[in-house]
Swiss-Prot record:
GO terms, molecular function: 1-deoxy-D-xylulose-5-phosphate synthase activity; magnesium ion binding; thiamine pyrophosphate binding
Cofactors named for this entry: Mg(2+); thiamine diphosphate
Pathway it works in: Metabolic intermediate biosynthesis; 1-deoxy-D-xylulose 5-phosphate biosynthesis; 1-deoxy-D-xylulose 5-phosphate from D-glyceraldehyde 3-phosphate and pyruvate: step 1/1
Keyword tags: Isoprene biosynthesis, Magnesium, Metal-binding, Thiamine biosynthesis, Thiamine pyrophosphate, Transferase
Gene3D superfamilies linked to this entry: 3.40.50.920, 3.40.50.970
UniProt function note: Catalyzes the acyloin condensation reaction between C atoms 2 and 3 of pyruvate and glyceraldehyde 3-phosphate to yield 1-deoxy-D-xylulose-5-phosphate (DXP).
NCBIfam families tied to this protein: dxs (TIGR00204), PRK05444.2-2 (NF003933)
HAMAP family cross-referenced by the UniProt entry: DXP_synth
Name of this protein: 1-deoxy-D-xylulose-5-phosphate synthase
Binding site for Mg(2+): D158, N188
EC number of this enzyme: 2.2.1.7
Sequence similarity: Belongs to the transketolase family. DXPS subfamily.
Species for this entry: Burkholderia cenocepacia (strain HI2424)
InterPro entries in alphabetical order: Dxylulose-5-P_synthase, THDP-binding, Transketo_C/PFOR_II, Transketolase-like_Pyr-bd, Transketolase_BS, Transketolase_C, Transketolase_CS
Gene: dxs
């Protein structure tokens, strides 16, 4: 039984799917019903994602594997950990969330990733790459220590296997001989041809069977008295299997390698998993799947359909007919190409985010200076440091949330040696539908405390371009942060202008009398809503531009000429840009009340970006409300008077 193409007409009845409220219902089905169920599930995923937006290609590729896992294993007693987690829509649908899929990634809706608080079937929260094997191994060992008999399963993609953490976990897991651990490599890199046919089914069943495992162990025990013979037997086995599968690497880690098998063929998946269920020790199953499976348009262009917005499945994704504002990612991509054209020392680095970071054109035009290092953020940062020692100008394009993974390298390998590496930090601040796992909430706080760092926050597209240019001129590590999505509509200026280091600018001045004068010190994306709030309150607004070094002279000048100071940033308040202003104020010796606004000390959920900003009080109305309540209301006057009298 193998996946079929979806014939989309929007009228699928889902007769089988609507009977599945949890995996126990699935396990009551006859095996012959599973492929029709898979067809319905795939159609449901397509229909659902087309209405909400979300990850599509990866989910179309995991339908049969998801069904097989829940059919064979006793979930949730048996644990499944999904690496990255954006391929879990079929899993969510089969585990009681079918009727909530309309709210996927929406404000107050279900998450696009596994979430422990959402379902007992989401055994471990994931969204960043390459964590699944470590988590599943911890579960397997924990179950052993607790005396529980359960399997722990990690499902990891071929891309995630490039990260060092995955191999660290496998190195640890390989010595856990009794652990009931299964690692499934979901290989959807189509440079590897899917193995199909009776021979591959036979090999997979053979290698996952008890006879094969017992015979292999028995032969090794018998031949262990003659080490040279044992070594010869091992080499013969590896050679024989190597003609069919790349087993040697994983078996060197102590895993029993099985596969590769067709990940869309339930007649291969189910008996193989049933055999594995009877084994002990670390097992490694290699399944080959296809992103976008069953939907021709996604099969043809899985990148385009990786994370689409809403679209008509019958027609596919159509180019927008209305001119869109340029995104900050596009601004970065254009800037990088322009700088590379001017200076042959400019080198671009991305940890597996070529499209997302806006480096497609750079790769085409400057292929010899483009480096996609895979999902390896730690390596990317240290690699950039090495390039800098040779007089090159490395630019690391990285999402804020992923820079967290290379913090030691940022400190030890770049900042400590004061190497001139530029960090173009995309997706800074809230990221909307991707939620807390991808929010760029912490970069200002965790970078600001590092010596030698310069940090800028862009308020519009042109400022972003000029900040990036300024960063490239610095003799030390420098970061420019900018948000996800479209900018403000400001045109970028082709000519470069270096921004004076550590200098902000006043964008609006108050006309209020003494006693009511408020100065808003805004950083990056918060300049626009701060200006909106200032119009309502008649306040001064400064575009601070630099988080480090913060413009201490401007902070002092505003403190001396205003009664109240307000700092606003789209990042965590603790240790962030506002804290830099407070420190500068303390250093100046000028005492003024300060209100720090930013992201709260909690993980902000997924949803529409504008709604989330409003929820956090970081839209124009929210900023004005907070200022009024703290400083300008009658209650604030009474409280302030009481403090002065005291």
């Amino acid at each position: 039984m193998r996946a079929r193409l979806i014939s989309y007409n929007g009228t699928t009845m889902y007769d089988l799917l609507k009977t599945i409220d949890d995996p126990a219902d699935l396990r009551r089905l006859d095996r012959r019903q599973l492929q029709p169920l898979a067809d319905e599930l795939r159609a449901f995923v397509l229909d659902s994602v087309s209405k909400t937006g979300g990850h599509l290609s990866s989910n179309l590729g995991t339908v049969e594997l998801t069904i097989a896992l829940h059919y064979v294993f006793n979930t949730p007693n048996d644990r499944i950990v999904w690496d990255v987690g954006h391929q879990t829509y079929p899993h969510k649908i089969l585990t009681g969330r079918r009727d909530q899929m309309h709210s996927l990634r929406q404000y107050d809706g279900i998450s696009g990733f596994p979430r422990r608080s959402e379902s007992e079937y989401d055994t471990f929260g994931t969204a960043h790459s390459s964590t699944s094997i470590s988590a599943a191994l911890g579960m397997a060992i924990g179950s052993q220590l607790n005396g529980d008999d359960r399997f722990s399963i990690a499902v990891i993609g071929d891309g995630a296997m490039t990260a060092g953490m995955a191999f660290e976990a496998m190195n640890n897991a390989g010595v856990s001989e009794d652990a009931k651990l299964l690692v499934i490599l979901n290989d959807n890199d189509m440079s590897i041809s899917p193995p199909v046919g009776a021979l591959n089914r036979h090999l997979a069943r053979l290698m996952s069977g008890r006879f094969y495992a017992a015979a292999r162990a028995g032969v090794e025990r018998v031949l262990s008295v003659a080490p040279p013979v044992l070594e010869l037997a091992r080499k013969l086995e590896e050679h024989a299997k190597g003609m069919v599968v790349p087993a040697t690497l994983f078996e060197e880690f102590g895993f029993n390698y099985i596969g590769p098998i067709d990940g869309h063929d339930l007649d291969s998946l189910i008996p193989t998993l049933q055999n594995i269920r009877e084994l002990r020790g670390p097992q490694f199953l290699h399944v080959v799947t296809k992103k976008g499976q069953g939907y021709k348009l996604a099969e043809a262009d899985p990148v385009l359909y990786h994370g689409p917005g809403k679209f008509n499945p019958a027609e596919g994704i159509k180019p927008s007919t209305t001119p869109a504002k340029k995104t900050y990612t596009q601004v970065f991509g254009e800037w990088l190409c322009d700088e590379a054209e001017r200076d042959t020392r400019v080198v671009g680095i991305t940890p597996a985010m070529r499209e997302g970071s806006g480096m497609v054109e750079f790769e085409k035009r400057f292929k010899d200076r483009y480096y996609d290092v895979g999902i390896a953020e730690q390596h990317a940062v240290t690699f950039a440091g090495g390039l800098a020692t040779e007089g090159l100008k490395p630019v690391v394009a990285i999402y804020s949330t992923f820079l967290q993974r290379a913090y030691d390298q940022l400190i030890h390998d770049v900042a400590l040696q004061n190497l001139p590496v530029v960090f173009a930090i995309d997706r800074a601040g809230l990221v909307g539908a991707d939620g807390a796992t991808h929010a760029g909430a912490y970069d200002l706080a965790f970078m600001r405390c590092i010596p030698n760092m310069t940090i800028m926050a862009a308020s519009d597209e042109n400022e972003c371009r000029q900040m990036l240019h300024t960063a490239l001129q610095q003799p030390n590590p420098t970061a420019v942060r900018y948000p996800r999505g479209a900018g403000t509509g400001v045109a970028t200026v082709k000519e470069f202008t270096e921004i004076p280091l550590g200098k902000g600018e006043v964008r609006r001045r108050t006309s209020q009398p003494e006693g009511k004068r408020v100065a808003i010190l805004a950083f990056g994306t918060m300049v626009a809503p701060s200006l909106a709030a200032a119009e309502e309150l008649d306040a001064t607004v400064a575009n601070m531009r630099f988080v480090k070094p913060v413009d201490a002279a401007l902070v002092r000048e505003l403190a001396e000429t205003h009664d109240y100071l307000v700092t606003v940033e789209e990042g965590c308040v603790m240790g962030g840009a506002g804290s830099a202003c407070v420190e500068a104020l303390m250093e100046s010796g000028v005492i003024r009340p300060v209100l720090q606004l930013g992201l709260p000390d909690q993980f902000v959920d997924h949803g529409d970006h504008a709604k989330l900003l409003a929820q956090c009080g970081l839209d124009g109305a929210g900023i004005a409300k907070s200022i009024r309540e703290r400083f300008l209301s009658p209650a604030a006057d009474v409280a302030g008077h009481a403090k002065r009298v005291a």
